[in-house]
Amino acid sequence: MNLRKLTGVTIAAVLALPMFASGANAYELVIPSLDYRTGAYGPNGIPVANGYTDYLTMLNERDGGINGVKIKNVTCETGYNTKKGVECYEKIKNTPPSGALVVQPLSTGITYQLIPKASVDEVPIFSMGYGRTSAANGKVFPWVFNFPATYWSQATALVQYIADQEGGLDALKGKKIYLVYHNSAYGKEPLRTLEAMAEKFGYEFRGLPVDHPGQEQKATWLQIRKEKPDWVLMWGWGVMNQVAIKEAASIRYPMDHFIGVWWSGSENDVMPAGDAADGYLSGAFHAGGGGFPAHDDIRKYVYDKGLGKGDRDRIGE
């Protein structure tokens, strides 16, 4: 199933709903959230969960839902644990009245486990900016949508950025580019891409895995201090990001040569290091900040009514 067909089916289904919703107005569109507010990844999971819930609440308050049919947001805490994530999916997929219309796993590990289930259950998976990169091939994975970008495209973009700073792709030859990565399916996603580009452009590549949850990185950064890579990339998440940035500062690694994936670029990641994080870079697949019309509507229709899940001053974090 491609996205156009999915959209058409969804619209057709919603247009048919008022006949069921009239009178008691009981029919709701089930859009679940696989949240992780607890554990080592909670500092990043909490604002994601708050923002997602606030957006769905805004649609209900501003528009009466979708085409007048309210959204039912069912949450389940995964703790960013793959096993718990699969259990959450099984628990919520048949939630009445509509069943889950879409699932966002918010974890590459959980996404990998849910992909085989998607075509059987006919529940679309949105893994936007994460998950299995090869799932972008809709002919092979018709129920998975990982737009607007993938980890392979992010790795390519970061190498291109480095090349631009160094004077072109030819200037990469002989440079050292290291990757500090979360030792999981998520962190391993860019390895093949970076290895292939190293072979093509002649830079020396080395991957340095960091085990869950990422608090022990002394040896990693001592190795970086010793071997002096020209650039360090990071595929981190949660507390791993905070520790890495502090460790980089402690060995005085140049922050403007330290670049994180888009999941390593929040305020939560840099605040513990304070001014020492100045210059640190990260990728992104969207514009930052909370000054867009959707954010204004969240303030008006959600927080002004006391319905917000987080702090008003952290909208758009």
Predicted regions and their residues:
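Signal peptide-proximal N-terminal region
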Residues: 50-73, 166-170, 199-202
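Beta-alpha junction/loop-to-helix N-cap segments that form part of ligand/metal-binding clefts
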Residues: 30, 43-50, 62-138, 147, ...
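Extracellular/periplasmic periplasmic-binding protein-like sensory domains
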Residues: 248-317
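C-terminal segment of classical bacterial N-terminal signal peptides
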Residues: 16-24
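Extracytoplasmic "Venus flytrap"
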Residues: 31-53, 76-83, 107, 180-189, ...
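Extracellular/periplasmic Venus flytrap/periplasmic-binding protein
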Residues: 84, 94, 133-134, 142-251, ...
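Bacterial N-terminal signal peptides that target proteins for export
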Residues: 1-10
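Periplasmic-binding protein-like
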Residues: 93-106, 126-128, 176-180, 228-238, ...
